[in-house]
């Protein structure tokens, strides 16, 4: 042992901490279900968020899911065809929908906590066709004048691109199956289910990719 070497010196970890792995951004998977395709015209109806966590070996895993059903914002439209696809029943007695501001507060709080936990600067949205989700999220933030949006305003990680490179698949169901994940078509088009499956897909790809040193 060298004279100046600390007795209890530990080897440096072979992976970057979360705060440095993605340039200070914490990946957070988001999925929204909506009343159509136009974020300035159609209502936001469901949202779910899953922060990506890191274990002591530097491997990624999905964190806890935060989700909310939303009361359609006044003046926005809902295309009946969208409800047919999602299966959302707006007047269901157990929907327990929140106003937009309350719903955003509900899902943003654990995201901010995860950003703080890992010493990151802010969250970066991960999604399948991620800009669709980000545009609806940003539109809702603007409508209610939310001042504590933890997400980067325009940058995303899109699992369409990642899965296309990793597995040659761009449809979420096919990409998940190519990654060896289970897929239940009956549960698809729920914000919670799609978010959790996208989070598993992102972790599977990210864990297979050697991080920077």
Swiss-Prot record:
One of its GO terms (biological process) is tRNA processing. SUPFAM superfamilies: Ribonuclease H-like. The record marks 37, 132, 154 as: Important for substrate binding and specificity. It holds the Pfam family RNase_T. Its cofactor is Mg(2+). Binds two Mg(2+) per subunit. The active form of the enzyme binds two Mg(2+) ions in its active site. The first Mg(2+) forms only one salt bridge with the protein. GO terms for molecular function: 3'-5' exonuclease activity; magnesium ion binding; nucleic acid binding; RNA exonuclease activity, producing 5'-phosphomonoesters. The keyword Methyltransferase does not apply. Homodimer. Belongs to the RNase T family. HAMAP family: RNase_T. NCBIfam families: RNaseT (TIGR01298). Trims short 3' overhangs of a variety of RNA species, leaving a one or two nucleotide 3' overhang. Responsible for the end-turnover of tRNA: specifically removes the terminal AMP residue from uncharged tRNA (tRNA-C-C-A). Also appears to be involved in tRNA biosynthesis. This is Ribonuclease T.
């Amino acid at each position: 042992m060298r004279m100046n070497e600390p007795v209890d010196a530990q080897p440096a970890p072979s992976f970057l901490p979360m705060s440095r792995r993605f340039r200070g951004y914490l990946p957070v998977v988001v999925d929204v279900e909506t009343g159509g395709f136009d974020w300035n015209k159609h209502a936001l109806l469901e949202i779910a968020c899953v922060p990506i966590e890191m274990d002591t070996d530097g491997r990624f895993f999905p964190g806890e899911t935060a989700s909310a059903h939303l009361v359609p914002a006044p003046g926005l439209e809902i295309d009946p065809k969208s409800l047919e696809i999602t299966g959302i029943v707006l007047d269901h007695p157990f929907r327990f929908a929140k106003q937009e501001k309350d719903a955003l507060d509900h899902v943003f709080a654990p995201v901010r906590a995860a950003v703080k936990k890992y010493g990151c600067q802010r969250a970066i949205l991960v999604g399948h066709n991620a800009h669709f989700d980000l545009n609806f999220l940003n539109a809702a933030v603007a409508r209610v004048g939310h001042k504590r949006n933890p997400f980067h305003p325009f940058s995303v990680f899109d699992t369409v691109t990642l899965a296309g490179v990793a597995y040659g698949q761009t449809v979420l169901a096919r990409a998940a199956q190519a990654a060896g994940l289970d897929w239940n078509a009956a549960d698809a088009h729920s914000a919670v289910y799609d978010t959790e499956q996208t989070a598993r897909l992102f972790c599977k790809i990210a864990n297979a990719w050697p991080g920077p040193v």
